[in-house]
């Protein structure tokens, strides 16, 4: 566990305290005991249990670093062991996650030991955010496995939306032939080389594709077919 305080300065400029190094071992022991007891009782749904575990854990912040990642890993462990899909807090939406935690902190209060023993009624704001996140993940999984359109591609958990059909065509051509050249893309698409280069640059910038040192293309986006 941590050996020194790991308080943070929030984006609002105030200092937020987590559990002290002295408190941490006992609070973590309480957390594990509480989790085992709640699982045994079965009064909380898996989503409620995962959300409340996450919040309590975050208020302890038991390690020097990586607490958020470990919290989300434990959430997925709890969800998956109960047959629920795992979730991802995507980088571009991390602010929503942090804001939900902050608003919940305002309700629960600043004392770390109180936060580490919060109940489900106190974390309504974070629970609402968490339930919506799980619901979106379920819908994404359903959309992915039921879609049969070969022109639809996914990246970072969402359908790639673009006005240009050539994006999907380039992805398909690169997947079929990673060594394809700009000249071959131009010929296959029936558009000029400059337009192809602009599309490819946009795709690289968006993270849909990458180029190996040997010049071959790596398609990172995922086709639904």
What do these predicted regions represent?
Residues 1-225:
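FIC/Doc superfamily catalytic core
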């Amino acid at each position: 566990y941590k050996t020194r305080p790991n308080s943070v300065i929030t984006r609002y400029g105030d200092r937020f305290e987590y559990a002290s190094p002295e408190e941490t071992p006992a609070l973590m022991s309480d957390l594990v005991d509480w989790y085992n007891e709640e699982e045994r009782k079965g009064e909380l749904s898996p989503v409620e249990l995962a959300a409340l575990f996450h919040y309590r854990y975050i208020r302890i912040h038991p390690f020097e670093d990586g607490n958020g990642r470990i919290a989300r890993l434990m959430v997925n462990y709890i969800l998956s062991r109960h047959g629920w899909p795992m979730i991802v807090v995507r980088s571009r939406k991390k602010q929503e996650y942090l804001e939900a935690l902050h608003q919940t902190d305002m309700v629960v209060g600043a004392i770390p030991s109180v936060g580490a023993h919060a109940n489900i009624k106190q974390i309504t704001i974070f629970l609402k955010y968490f339930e919506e996140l799980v619901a979106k993940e379920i819908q994404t999984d359903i959309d992915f496995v039921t879609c049969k359109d070969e022109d639809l591609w996914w990246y970072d958990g969402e359908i790639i939306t673009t006005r240009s059909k050539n994006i999907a065509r380039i992805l398909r051509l690169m997947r079929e032939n990673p060594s394809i050249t700009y000249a071959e893309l131009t010929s296959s698409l029936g558009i000029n080389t400059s337009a192809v280069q602009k599309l490819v640059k946009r795709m690289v910038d968006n993270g849909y594709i990458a180029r190996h040192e040997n010049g071959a293309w790596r398609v990172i986006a995922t086709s639904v077919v």
